Amino acid sequence: ETEIELTINKHKYLAFIIEDIVKVQANYNVAEAYRSAQKEAVLRAIDSDLAGLHASAGTNVAGGATVDDADMLAVVLALDLANVPQSERYGIVGAKVMGDLRAVNRYSVFDQTGKEGLAVSGKGLVTTAYGFELDMSNNVVDDTTNTHNLFFHKSAMSLALQLKPTYKMEDSVDYIGVKSVLHTIYGVAVERSAALVDLERNS
């Protein structure tokens, strides 16, 4: 097997101070509100670093101004030709591509899918297509020319956490409040480029 080198070189965190006067006067749990913001910021950073691996994709599919069914079939073909397993395939797409997929009747209307149409189902996302489990994230890379939407097998990319997201808190006499930080140390890498497809759509 080919040896994969994964460098753990990313340290992401969000820190803040809750002053005692804020904590005392607020009528809600200030620390809990900020903790949610910390989680979102750190997870978004990890998400963005994984999205940045598009440059190492084994195949690029040009979706142009609108992604359609033919583009999706090109993505499927690229993985099939690379002998990528049919199971555990995933797609992470930006809002514009999700909008394009909603407009493809094959994925979204009853007479094509046999399921309640997206327009009336109460579910706004196309969640599956050609064996891919789809999710939407606006953290996909937008280089002002194209957005880079990723389709991949689970073996394509690796995330190694040297320090899982960890909280630290301490009282501060200097600032008369509580210091809080959520941080993590990790690395990301493409492990199997042939199992990663970059579907490009005009920005």
Where are these regions (language model features)?
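Short amphipathic alpha-helical segments, especially helix-boundary/capping motifs
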Residues: 11-15, 51-53, 153-154
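Residues at beta-strand starts and edge strands
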Residues: 12, 32, 87, 174-178
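Extended, solvent-exposed, turn-rich assembly/linker loops in the middle of proteins
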Residues: 54-124, 128
